[in-house]
Regions:
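Hydrophobic-face positions in mid-chain alpha helices that act as interaction patches
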Residues: 1-87, 93, 99-163, 167, ...
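Conserved small/polar residues in nucleotide/adenosyl-binding loops
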Residues: 177-183
């Protein structure tokens, strides 16, 4: 696991959408002087994020996703947010309004990610330095209303699929639903 690295492509996609997971999802590599890992900022940083396709090989070279430490998070066969994303996707493909289903999916996906982040914080204990504040339901709703809804209006299916991609990333440790999606 020491050869894993935080993804620059995921960081940049989360930043593009101003997604609240960005402030919680990544941690720096071990700071030996401070004896811990810090919550990584969402700004580009080659010491934290591995460049897509050209990472430098080595152990503990980059930061990692906080999801790596969510070992005791539940493994979901089918989560509520996945079900709502499937509904939103089907409605989009039928040319119908999917905004309500998409909002439920996005909010539930953010809160599920926060559950994994909280579990990871417990796993890391006080070795996680300056952790970012938790994603709240209010923040998740605001993210949808102020960011996602505008892109949904212009590109409903694309927005649904991107938000689904974000929500399935790290979904409770290992996600059966994501494996199924890839097949």
């Amino acid at each position: 696991r020491a050869a894993l690295g935080a993804s620059e492509s995921m960081r940049s996609k989360l930043a593009e959408y101003n997604d609240p997971r960005l402030s919680r999802a990544f941690i720096t590599k071990l700071d030996k002087e401070k004896e811990g890992k810090a919550q990584a900022p969402g700004t580009p940083d080659t010491d934290v994020y591995a460049p897509s396709g050209t990472p430098e090989q080595g152990t503990s070279k980059y930061g990692t996703s906080l999801f790596m430490y969510s070992a005791t998070a539940p493994t979901l066969l089918m989560s509520f947010h996945e079900l709502k994303f499937l509904e939103a996707e089907a409605l989009c493909r039928l040319g119908r309004d999917a905004k309500s289903a998409l909002k439920e999916a996005v909010v539930a996906g953010l809160l599920n990610a926060e559950n994994s982040f909280s579990i990871s914080r417990k796993e890391l204990g006080n070795t996680l330095l300056n952790p970012a504040s938790a994603i709240t339901e209010e923040e998740a709703n605001s993210y949808f209303d102020n960011t996602v809804e505008a892109t949904y209006t212009n590109e409903p299916l694309k927005t649904t699929m991107i938000q689904k991609y974000f929500a399935l990333w790290g979904a409770s440790g290992r996600s059966e639903e994501h494996t199924s999606e890839l097949q």
